[in-house]
Amino acid sequence: MIYQGENLSVDYIEPGIAHLVFNAKGSVNKLNLATLQSVGEAIDALYSQKDLQGLLLSSDKSAFIVGADITEFLGLFDIPTEELSDWLHQANAIFNRLEDIPVPTLSAITGFALGGGCECVLATDFRLADETASIGLPETQLGIMPGWGGSVRLPRLIGADPAMEVITTGKPKRAKDALALGMVDGVVSRETLITDSVTMLKKAIEGQLDWQSRRTQKKAPLKLSPLEAAMSFNVAKGMIMKMAGKHYPAPMTAVKSIENSAFMDRDAALEVENKNFVALTQTDVAKSLVGIFLNDQLVKSKAKQAIKNSEPVTSAAVLGAGIMGGGIAYQSASKGVPVLMKDIAQQSLDLGMSEASKLLNKQLERGRLSGLKMAKVLSSITPSLNYASIENKDIVVEAVVENPKVKAAVLAEVENEVNEHAILASNTSTIPISLLAKSLKRPENFCGMHFFNPVHRMPLVEVIRGEKTSQQTIDRVVAYASQMGKTPIVINDCPGFFVNRVLFPYFAGFSLLLRDGGDYQQIDNVMEKEFGWPMGPAYLLDVVGIDTAHHAQAVMAQGFPERMAKNGRDVIDAMFESDRYGQKNGSGFYAYSIDRKGKPKKNIDESTAGIIATVTNTTQPYTSEQISARMMIPMINEVIRCLDEGIIASPAEADMALVYGLGFPPFKGGVFRYLDAIGLTTYLDMAKEFEHLGAVYQVPESIKQKAADDECYYPAPQSLSAPSA
């Protein structure tokens, strides 16, 4: 044994050929701080081997290395920048020593080689992959860029243009695509990966493969003329500005880093990468995007626990077809859970099946599923005008019209048809679950299961716990949502649950802003371009449906009269009374036409101003800062109240629900990450300016206390000193 560490070992696989195997105790290999230190120690041990002729790197798991340990990132970002820069120098010295070892080196890649794992294999002379390999540098998706030589070695290996595409998109390449780009030198079967790798290394040792010229290429400047460089980098920067925009600086920073180091050798180029990596770690964007990743892991870990605690759902039913019912049925069937779709109208069943067929056809056209698979999914959706076979279903999702009396009647009816262990779930968006449960004999088997529209695109499912809902029911519905490929978050019952409860104060802020003379187009522009929402409030209301919003607004006002009761007629009333329902009937705040792809196209409607004029007496200019504040304060206050009341369990789950359910700007990380970033005192000062506007602008006492105690919503990252490498 040449070296034995906790996460890797090195020994000879054949005379003269050393084999470094990543073999962490867990299910995957991560290039965490401890493993990186072990890599350095192992390489030091290899340098002392007089009989060494070649080095092979591999993993004993189904993935090579899934990346760095992201749980360590926020702690690293928090250390002084000089210390972080020094540590990066030490880490890169390890990869440089791997690259400079005076024998040929090869990485045998199975499964994921991402982030630091990819940077590790880039430091070897050759890379051989099996068919399962997936190789990439996803750092820009976390608001940073490669920091262990990835932005230096990859452009020199495969060329600037393809390297910039790999780095700026953050999307990994499958084995065959990586081979076409030159990221790997061959693709072989998993069974022969190690033996083929040894054979390839022997060829390099014997001089049949020129490993030294390959190494020289990676350490030299890019082979670009000044004109080629100017064209390449200018085109890349233009595309990045269009793709990523101003809110996500990492892709542009990565391109500029590659550009500025293009004519440098490896060591000088690594200095440029170091400087840019450190700068990105200090941005709120990086902290927010890393925070989202960690929050997502928390939510998934809770779902995994629920899956362990429950039996998998093997058959389901949906009550109420149409577009929503069809979407739920499609999602269930496409993930392997057969579904009965029941409705009282044949026309609705036809619409539901049409929706499922349409979604499957799109998958077929894009090559994401075969005709055979499409037929199998469609055949596992059974449309029915009666309850035949429903007694065998594990779970029944009710998705009928959003009316409490209708829903209660349908739920009571179906409860008599199902077996006593079956779970009933309502897809209501606003009606309290405990209210609907009053019509049931077994309320412990009932909960909310709120999907978002369109079902196939929106990742969030709110699983709502009523007063009498059992934990067993919650666990099984969370497990079913996970089976469907969704992200379930458990919410305690209240009108609107979490997402809609916090959305309607935001709409109230919009109505008040229009009442006070704001311009809806400017508001949309500010909330989209400046704050970062995918849609401004007027456009969002059009997409949701102004009739739907009008009804939900009344439900919310009844549930929270002290804050959400309207003080007179507002713009949503005015639009509703004018039959301006939004995209669904072609006219809302905007007018809609159908483009060549069959999608609604937004156009300015000159008549909208006249309708808005009926609920305002003035026109008044507002700054972007005033608009953002007036729009966001009501939502932020309501989010805080939901946490205070235990409607949502943690800041992490609240932020994920906002990002996944509403499209809250990921670069801001969610409401609680945003509050921590700007500072609670700063928020209180901002809110104080608008407290005269009414109850939705009154900040909860809890945030005042937190600010007084100098606290944050998220715990401070674990303190790390610059690790020794």
Curated annotation (Swiss-Prot):
BP-aspect Gene Ontology terms: fatty acid beta-oxidation
Positions of the record's site feature: Important for catalytic activity: 119, 139
Region (Enoyl-CoA hydratase/isomerase): 1-189
Keywords from the named record: Fatty acid metabolism, Isomerase, Lipid degradation, Lipid metabolism, Lyase, Multifunctional enzyme, NAD, Oxidoreductase
Record-level GO cellular component terms: fatty acid beta-oxidation multienzyme complex
Pathway: Lipid metabolism; fatty acid beta-oxidation
PROSITE patterns: 3HCDH, ENOYL_COA_HYDRATASE
Region span, 3-hydroxyacyl-CoA dehydrogenase: 311-725
InterPro entries associated with the record: 3-OHacyl-CoA_DH_CS, 3-OHacyl-CoA_DH_NAD-bd, 3HC_DH_C, 6-PGluconate_DH-like_C_sf, ClpP/crotonase-like_dom_sf, Enoyl-CoA_hyd/isom_CS, Enoyl-CoA_hydra/iso, FA_oxidation_alpha_subunit
Gene Ontology molecular function: 3-hydroxybutyryl-CoA epimerase activity; delta(3)-delta(2)-enoyl-CoA isomerase activity; enoyl-CoA hydratase activity; long-chain-3-hydroxyacyl-CoA dehydrogenase activity; NAD+ binding
Enzyme Commission identifier(s): 4.2.1.17, 5.1.2.3, 5.3.3.8, 1.1.1.35
Keyword Zinc found: no
Reactions mediated catalytically: a (3S)-3-hydroxyacyl-CoA + NAD(+) = a 3-oxoacyl-CoA + NADH + H(+); a (3S)-3-hydroxyacyl-CoA = a (2E)-enoyl-CoA + H2O; a 4-saturated-(3S)-3-hydroxyacyl-CoA = a (3E)-enoyl-CoA + H2O; (3S)-3-hydroxybutanoyl-CoA = (3R)-3-hydroxybutanoyl-CoA
Binding positions (substrate): 296, 500, 660
Record has Lipid metabolism as a keyword: yes
Binding-site residues, NAD(+): 324, 343, 400-402, 407, 429, 453
Active site as annotated: 450
Classification via Gene3D superfamilies: 1.10.1040.50, 2-enoyl-CoA Hydratase, Chain A, domain 1, NAD(P)-binding Rossmann-like Domain
Family according to the record: In the N-terminal section; belongs to the enoyl-CoA hydratase/isomerase family.
NCBIfam families on file: FadB (TIGR02437), PRK11730.1 (NF008727)
Record note on quaternary structure: Heterotetramer of two alpha chains (FadB) and two beta chains (FadA).
Record function comment: Involved in the aerobic and anaerobic degradation of long-chain fatty acids via beta-oxidation cycle. Catalyzes the formation of 3-oxoacyl-CoA from enoyl-CoA via L-3-hydroxyacyl-CoA. It can also use D-3-hydroxyacyl-CoA and cis-3-enoyl-CoA as substrate.
Name listed for the protein in its UniProt record: Fatty acid oxidation complex subunit alpha
